[in-house]
Every structure is written in C-alpha cells, then in structure tokens.
Design a protein with these regions (language model features):
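A glycine-rich beta-to-alpha transition motif near the start of alpha/beta enzyme domains, typified by
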Residues: 1-117, 156-265
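Short glycine-rich anion-binding loops that position phosphate/pyrophosphate groups of nucleotides
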Residues: 70, 128, 153
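Short, solvent-exposed secondary-structure boundary/capping segments
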Residues: 117-125
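Short, charged beta-turn/beta-strand-edge "cap" motif at the junction between a beta-strand
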Residues: 127-128, 240
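Short, charged/polar, Gly/Pro-enriched secondary-structure boundary elements
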Residues: 129-133, 260
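Glycine-rich, charged/polar anion/phosphate-binding loops
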Residues: 132-133, 141-144, 172-174, 184
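Internal active-site segments that recognize and position negatively charged phosphoryl groups
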Residues: 136-164
Length: 265
C-alpha cells in the first residue's frame, strides 16, 4: 500500500542569476493559485522559490505564463521568470525563438547559446514607460527616484554607496500610498560609462539576488539621466545581465534548469 499522498504537482525549478522560480503546468492545480504559490515558494515547508510561473496553453504564443510572487500576489511579469519559462520550453523542443504571453503582453525570447542546462537568451522587453521623477518623504526615509514601468512598476534610486538598511528603506518605499499597487525598488550605483551595480527589493518577495525587469528599469533610468550609454552591463549579487535600449529594451542573460520534482498536496 502506498503511503504517499494521492495528489502531486510536478514542477521544474529554474534560476536566472539567482532569482529562482518554479515552473508548473496550470492544469495541475484546481484550487487557488495564490495559496498554492505561497505553499510552493515556502523555503522551509515547500520547495522554495521567489515565485511560480503557472503555464497555460495559448492560441498565439508558445505558452502563456501567470506569475505569482512568494507571498501569493500576482505580478504582471518577471524578466528572469520569463527566461526561466523559455529555458523549460528550450529543453523540450529545438527552437531559436520562444513567444511567451505574460501579464504585460507577448514577449519574444531569442536563444543565443546553451551550455548543458544553462540557456542564454535575449528577450524583447518592449517599450519602457517613464512617468518621471518622484520624491518620497517619510519618517526615517527620504529618496528621490525615477519611476519606470517595464510592464510592472519600478522606482529607481541612484546612490554613490548602497546605504545601510536599504532593504528596510526599500520595503517602506514599496508600500507607499504613492504606489497603489506597490512597486519594485532598485538602488543603483554607476560604476562606469556602460556599467551599473544594483540592489533590489521586489514587491511581493523582498530582497532578491537579481531581477530582469529591475535590470531593465535601472539601465533605462541611468540612460535617460545621461549617467551611462547603451548597452549597459548590470551587475547584481546573483550575476550579470546586459540591457540594450534600441527602440525596444532588450535583456540578455542566462537561465539555468535546476531540478524537476513533485510536490505532495
């Protein structure tokens, strides 16, 4: 007699510059995706991840992906998560391009290289939207940042040195009334004419080692501010990505398949 649970959820775990995701077929779950995402992402009692990309069939794209953060909130898009989805697709079929539907529209990922389980993609992230600069004033935190939308909201703060306690500041900024849906917060230090270093507080996740859309937003804000020129090397704790702004914003970086398994429900 089997002692295993009757129901399991198959998953693939992938990482893009230390930003890790679980890739799961949406049809594997009949219940609440938000609650199941929280359970799956729990690093002590679940599999552990920054988010879950739930996959569904799509008439126009190779696949449709709905992204849920570790706290169960649904997000429009993750550049790193989209590359992780593309890596799963790339492991299943020979194709130089993958078209993925996200909450921020259709995104094309072009395969530029592969080394074992690591896939290198350039993703067309579309046009940035720049609402302008905004000053945030609150007890203990004062910051002037550039607002950038890459299909999801970002607030980019330029610093010479990353401040002590930036994680707490990022959390306070991310939940300000000025951002009704919350925002992602990036602290950016310019280290060369084509290079920046970033720290990231992601809405619905917290501190992360990397962010694809955060890298794009940071590079765009730096280019607009004439601090750097395209293409921009973006250095994060989890790795390096390259952002090119040529009409659309293009994001180049790796995605690595980590493992496959089953989650007992």
């Amino acid at each position: 007699m089997s002692i295993l649970p009757a129901r399991t959820i198959p998953f693939t775990k992938a990482s893009a510059c230390g930003n890790d995701f679980l890739i799961v077929e949406g049809g594997a779950v009949s219940g609440d995706l938000a609650e199941m995402s929280r359970r799956l992402c729990d690093r002590h009692n679940g599999v552990g991840a920054d988010g879950v990309e739930w996959l569904f069939p799509d008439d126009e794209a190779d696949i449709a992906a709905r992204l849920f953060n570790a706290d169960g909130s649904e997000a429009e898009i993750s550049g790193n998560g989209t590359r992780c989805v593309a890596a799963v697709l790339g492991s299943q079929k020979e194709s130089a391009e993958m078209l993925i539907r996200t909450g921020a529209g259709l995104k094309t990922c072009r395969l530029t290289g592969r080394r074992g389980a690591t896939f290198e993609f350039e993703a067309d992230m579309g046009d940035p939207i720049l609402p302008g600069e905004l000053a945030i004033e609150m007890p203990g935190v004062g910051a002037v940042g550039t607002q950038v939308s890459m299909g999801n909201p970002h607030f980019v703060v330029f610093v010479d040195v990353f401040p002590d306690g930036w994680q707490r500041q990022g959390m306070l900024i991310a939940t300000q009334p000025a951002f009704p849906q919350g925002t992602n917060v990036e602290y950016v230090s310019v280290i060369g004419p084509k290079e920046i270093e970033i720290r990231l507080f992601e809405r619905g996740v917290g501190e992360t080692r990397s962010s694809g859309t955060g890298s794009c937003a940071s590079a765009v804000a730096a280019i607009v501010g004439r601090r750097v020129s395209s293409p921009v090397k973006v250095v994060a704790p989890g790795g390096v990505q390259t952002v090119r702004w040529d009409g659309h914003v293009y994001l180049q970086g790796p995605a690595t398949l980590i493992c496959r398994g089953e989650f007992f429900v």
